[in-house]
């Protein structure tokens, strides 16, 4: 299912190894269903000795993975809270900053450099890419707008300098044709905080419904200078034009490593 996944393992006896294998089978089975809904990327699971049930198979946070160097990284939980992974060193996604779904357990110990110390049970990157301008979209021929729905969900949110969207569209279902998704800025000269989500089926069939998850970096928008503004999102739905508003504040610090993250979603996106 995840041919490029990296799995961190502890030394264990044969009995524990069998138990962990059964646990991972359950996790992979459940995550297969989850990825067909959310189009997830590079899966990394961290084995432990506790079988705490199915709760740990579900994501309990959407984070930004921020590499510090090759040996360390931290996770931004929202605009204000940072997490230090106690059981991981270098980012499993390399030098790229990415958005990711994760399941973590908060530890009682204190972190010296961040707000919370956590144990990462598993983490899975999502497609992360920069927003583009109207001029860039036209120059690259990214003007097509096939119908799509934005799903009201806890992962559909503007935070930490990103707009993360769960969207719903029709797919052929054979994972052969990538759908193209982009966020375009500068669509309204009178409102620099209005952006447009564009979805291109790229000639894919329209046989089944499926959901995708994508995060767009918003560092090209004007600095809100610490204030919270309304970010307006527009898109072409199956019933006509729609829009939604999000609370948005420019990220206080900008780290290197922008650009498109190399991920391998279950539903193919670009």
Task: Set out the residue ranges of the language-model regions.
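First exposed extracellular module after export/assembly in secreted or surface-exposed proteins
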Residues: 2-23, 56-270
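Bacterial N-terminal signal peptides that target proteins for export
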Residues: 23-33
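Hydrophobic helical h-region of N-terminal Sec-dependent signal peptides
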Residues: 32-36, 40
């Amino acid at each position: 299912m995840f041919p490029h996944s990296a799995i961190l393992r502890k030394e264990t006896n044969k009995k524990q190894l069998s138990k962990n294998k059964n646990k991972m089978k359950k996790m992979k089975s459940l995550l297969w269903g989850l990825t067909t809904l959310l189009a997830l990327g590079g899966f990394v699971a961290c084995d432990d000795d506790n079988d705490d049930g199915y709760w740990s198979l579900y994501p309990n946070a959407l984070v930004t993975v921020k590499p510090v160097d090759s040996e360390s990284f931290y996770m931004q939980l929202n605009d204000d809270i940072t997490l230090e992974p106690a059981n991981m060193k270098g980012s499993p996604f390399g030098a790229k900053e990415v958005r990711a779904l994760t399941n973590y357990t908060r530890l009682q110990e204190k972190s010296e450099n961040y707000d919370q110390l956590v144990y990462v049970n598993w983490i899975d990157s999502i497609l992360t890419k920069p927003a583009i301008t109207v001029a860039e979209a036209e120059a690259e021929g990214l003007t097509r707008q096939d119908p799509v729905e934005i799903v009201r969900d806890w992962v559909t949110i503007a935070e930490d300098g990103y707009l993360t969207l769960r969207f719903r569209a029709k797919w052929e279902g054979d994972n052969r044709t990538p759908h193209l998704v982009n966020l375009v800025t500068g669509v309204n000269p009178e409102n620099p905080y209005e952006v447009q989500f564009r979805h291109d089926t790229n000639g894919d069939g329209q046989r089944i419904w499926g959901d995708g998850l994508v995060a767009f970096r918003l560092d090209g928008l004007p600095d809100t200078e610490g204030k919270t503004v309304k970010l307006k999102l527009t898109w072409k739905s199956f019933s006509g034009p729609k829009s939604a508003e999000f609370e948005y504040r420019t990220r206080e610090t900008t780290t290197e490593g922008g650009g498109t993250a190399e991920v391998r979603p279950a539903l193919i996106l670009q």
